[in-house]
Amino acid sequence: MNPPTDQDKPTLLLVDDDEAFRKVLARAMERRGYDVTTAPDVPAALAVAQQQPPEYAVVDLKMPGESGLVLIEKLIELDPNTRIVMLTGYASIATAIEAIKLGATHYLAKPVDADQVVAALNK
């Protein structure tokens, strides 16, 4: 059996303004078989997604400039089938409900690890 090529790997857009967290989670997700693209904020994430909408997205709620909620809405407009997990260090029921209404499939409170993210993406 041949190892999966990048074309066979599911695409994942990881958006978080915390560079250290972003790098660690990106490496962990790559080891779990995802083709990961990262972005530090909403404008950079949209630039990537408009070129190729991701199959999966992991989006931080609080980032400089626009909120992750704005990004969720725009990602769903690009491709309604994108599975999105919202991450936040500021968990609240109201925000979780808003994220789900906008199209997120799951909501996780930080700190999280890659196994939790994979489980949420696959629910």
Describe these PLM feature segments.
Residues 23-31:
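Charged docking surfaces used in two-component/phosphorelay signaling
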Residues 16, 60, 88:
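Active-site residues of response regulator receiver
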Residues 52-58, 63:
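Active-site beta3 strand of CheY-like receiver
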Residues 22, 64, 88, 92:
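The feature encodes the CheY-like receiver
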Residues 41, 67-70:
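Acidic catalytic/metal-coordinating carboxylates
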Residues 33-40, 48:
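Short hydrophobic/Thr-rich beta-strand motif most characteristic of the beta2 strand and flanking loop
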Residues 47, 69-81, 98:
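Short amphipathic alpha-helix used as the core "switch/output" element in two-component signaling
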